[in-house]
């Protein structure tokens, strides 16, 4: 899957030209960008994991965050067949580095740091599998139809 953002070499004029081109073709979908940590939620074989984007150089495995978020119980109960959601773990009005500061902690410390306005949330922006159905070959216009269903199944005010 490819998600697009402007190259850092684009100046304001070049960005506007690209936006105008996309608007004139009607070949675009947009969504709110949240500054957090990209991650995937995976339900498979009766288990649920919330994984990082990259493999750790230290452990050689993907980071797992499901024990570091307050919405973990809602995640565990949401699906019983293969489902994979792509999204961003974020802090309301926070930045990526602030999210990372919490997620790099051990689970107990990560949970204790989430107080007041420092509570980690999750924004779903894509769905690759839903209840055993692969959506990998489906266009984004079809996959995004599953986002409200997924958020409803998770049933947590911290996930949208």
Regions from the PLM with identified roles:
Residues 1-24, 30:
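Charged, flexible boundary elements
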């Amino acid at each position: 899957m490819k998600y697009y953002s402007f190259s850092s070499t684009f100046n304001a004029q070049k960005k506007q030209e690209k936006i105008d081109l996309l608007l004139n073709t009607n070949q675009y979908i947009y969504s709110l960008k949240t500054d957090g940590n990209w991650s995937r939620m995976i339900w498979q074989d009766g288990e649920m994991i919330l994984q990082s984007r990259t493999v750790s150089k230290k452990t050689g495995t993907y980071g797992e965050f499901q024990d570091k978020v307050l919405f973990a119980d809602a995640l565990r109960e949401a699906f019983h067949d293969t489902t994979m959601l792509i999204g961003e773990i974020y802090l309301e009005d926070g930045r990526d580095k602030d999210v990372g500061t919490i997620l790099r902690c051990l689970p107990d410390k990560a949970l204790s740091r989430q107080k007041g306005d420092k509570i980690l949330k999750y924004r779903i922006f894509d769905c690759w599998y839903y209840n055993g159905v692969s959506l990998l070959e489906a266009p984004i216009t079809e996959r995004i139809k599953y986002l409200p269903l997924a958020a409803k199944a998770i049933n947590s005010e911290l996930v949208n």
